[in-house]
């Protein structure tokens, strides 16, 4: 929120809505700050897929946000665009650990450019779309970089928490021209991921291969 306040100060801008991808801890738990104990917000539009909506309505303390009208739920439908000013946002399903809700990514189309946002997904081979073709058809592709490589979590079976390793994503996209690889931005890094360190050898390797590593404060012009 500090970064957001710096980039879009609340004296000039208001929060016009929040889109949620799925019901995993890092993607919805911040909603609680809209509640009476903190912001006490008024009817902030909350864009949710059907299963995600059911999760919010059926479980406290999130259900209280609806009851007290801190948020106002707007239901999303898969592959159906929502028009917001000059931006169209379209949710699409991606395979993930859907214990509590479906999981979506978002296509975000502005007047001149299109961004793809996929913070969480299982292995790319499980998706019914070609990541290579998605990159070719987009201007910015922000993808899951939770873990850099296998073995990053000592003592854990990483197949139980599936994500595409950064090394796997780079290998999959390695045959793209250098310019096309520059559309790809790695996001959603776990605290164990060496890409968080801008000076790490892994960060330098990724950049040398033509890919980008998202940092706080980055802007994407649509």
Regions found by a protein language model. Name each.
Residues 1-7, 73-134, 218-222:
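Core dinuclear metal-dependent hydrolase active-site scaffold
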Residues 1-47, 139:
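Active-site metal-binding motif and surrounding structural segment of the metallo-beta-lactamase
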Residues 18, 46-48, 116-117, 186:
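Structural beta-sheet core signal
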Residues 42, 66-72, 85-87, 207-210:
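A short helix-to-beta-strand connector/capping loop
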Residues 51-61:
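A short, active-site helix/loop in glycosyltransferases that binds the activated sugar's phosphate group
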Residues 114, 122-219:
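Cap/insert and terminal regions of metallo-dependent hydrolase folds
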């Amino acid at each position: 929120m500090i970064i957001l306040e710096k980039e879009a100060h609340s004296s000039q801008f208001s929060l016009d809505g929040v889109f949620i991808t799925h019901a995993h801890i890092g993607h919805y738990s911040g909603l609680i700050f809209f509640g009476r104990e903190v912001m006490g917000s008024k009817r902030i539009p909350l864009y949710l897929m059907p299963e995600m909506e059911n999760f919010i309505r059926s479980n406290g303390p999130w259900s209280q946000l609806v009851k007290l009208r801190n948020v106002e739920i707007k239901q999303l439908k898969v592959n159906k665009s929502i028009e917001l000013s000059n931006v169209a946002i379209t949710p699409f399903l991606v395979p993930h650990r859907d214990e509590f809700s479906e999981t979506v990514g978002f296509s975000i189309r502005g007047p001149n450019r299109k961004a793809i946002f996929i913070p969480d997904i299982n292995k790319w081979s499980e998706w019914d779309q070609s990541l290579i073709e998605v990159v070719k058809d987009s201007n910015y592709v922000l993808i899951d970089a939770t873990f850099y490589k296998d073995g990053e979590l000592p003592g854990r079976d990483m197949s139980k928490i599936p994500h595409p390793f950064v090394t796997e994503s780079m290998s999959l996209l390695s045959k793209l021209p250098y310019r096309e690889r520059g559309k790809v931005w790695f996001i959603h890094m776990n605290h164990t991921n060496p890409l968080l360190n801008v000076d790490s050898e892994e960060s330098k390797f990724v950049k040398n291969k033509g890919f980008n590593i998202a940092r706080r404060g980055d802007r994407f012009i649509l």
